[in-house]
Amino acid sequence: MKFSDIISKLEVTNYSLTQNPNNDPEITGMAAIDEATSGTLSYIEGAKFASFIAKTNASALILPQNEAMQAQAQERGIVWMATPEPRLLFAKAIALFYQPYTPTPEIHPTAVIHPTAKIGNDVYIGPHVVIQPGVEIGNGVIIHPNVVIYPGVKIGDRTILHANCTIEERSQIGADCVIHSGAVIGGEGFGFVPTRTGWYKMEQSGYVVLEDRVDIGCNTTIDRPSVGETRVGYDTKIDNLVQIAHGCQIGAGCAIAAQTGMAGGVKLGNRVILAGQVGIANQAKMGDGSTASAQTGILHDVKPGEVVSGTPAIPHKMYLKIAALYSRLPDMYQAFRQSQRQLEEEGKR
């Protein structure tokens, strides 16, 4: 595919092009900037990666709107397209060369489907899938091998369930969701009441709701509560190995990275970003547009738009100032001890 054909298929409106329109290389694939070979298209997102332009073997680049970077590519004879969102354009270009595996609609003979289940049109149900009573499956749903769907579950149109995931009782999965292998949606919340003789198990009668366009990574667990619902909002993306406890309410457009854990009743607003290994304590709230950096421990509420780091969480700028002092602490302590000794000696005179 010619570079010019890629640009036209991306339907970009706000962009600029290389000053050599006669150079229109054949693009055979996509590659990271440091792994690109002749015939591949790559991208650079920001100025801190500009040094790669001098070393890359890519035939074409998607660049930010940075004249210095564009001139550098021009000098090397690399054709380019500049846009305010190079990573987004690169992601769209990948889709021109790669299409994920989509099985032909069918129901495999080894699938076990209860007669009360309702199955939509153009559905694929793979080997050894188990679909229990009262389940409703929308149109165009793909259910890969060994998936287990408990009673009363509802799954919206075009949702994809990858192999070996489990959707437990009464869960409601929206349209265009993707649930990856090993995930468990709607498992029992951690509900036990202490008594004088041990723990009394509180039945978890609630359910989980995933709104439309939610992505759930491998081995992530989202628990149902004792009453009510656990909810994940529209277009939220959740990475692998995330634990979301009973009764959590997650807003729309959030991004949650791997190994994050939320205790019961946590509430996230819209567009909240959690980096890896964030821990959030019971009932804590994070406002719209707030962010927690990696390994943050959130014990109290976070204001809308606030960026926090550390344990317990503090404003990110304050955390950076404190972190800058860590390496100086031994010298500061020695200086303090020396001053202390001098004062003690002066006190003896």
UniProtKB/Swiss-Prot annotation:
Pfam families associated with the record: Hexapep, LpxD
GO molecular function, one term: N-acyltransferase activity
Catalytic site: H246 (proton acceptor)
Major enzyme class: transferase
Keyword Isomerase: no
Superkingdom assignment: Bacteria
Transmembrane segments: none
Catalytic activity reported: a UDP-3-O-[(3R)-3-hydroxyacyl]-alpha-D-glucosamine + a (3R)-hydroxyacyl-[ACP] = a UDP-2-N,3-O-bis[(3R)-3-hydroxyacyl]-alpha-D-glucosamine + holo-[ACP] + H(+)
Subunit structure: Homotrimer.
UniProt function note: Catalyzes the N-acylation of UDP-3-O-acylglucosamine using 3-hydroxyacyl-ACP as the acyl donor. Is involved in the biosynthesis of lipid A, a phosphorylated glycolipid that anchors the lipopolysaccharide to the outer membrane of the cell.
This protein's name: UDP-3-O-acylglucosamine N-acyltransferase
Taxonomic classification: Bacteria, Bacillati, Cyanobacteriota, Cyanophyceae, Nostocales
Gene name as annotated: lpxD
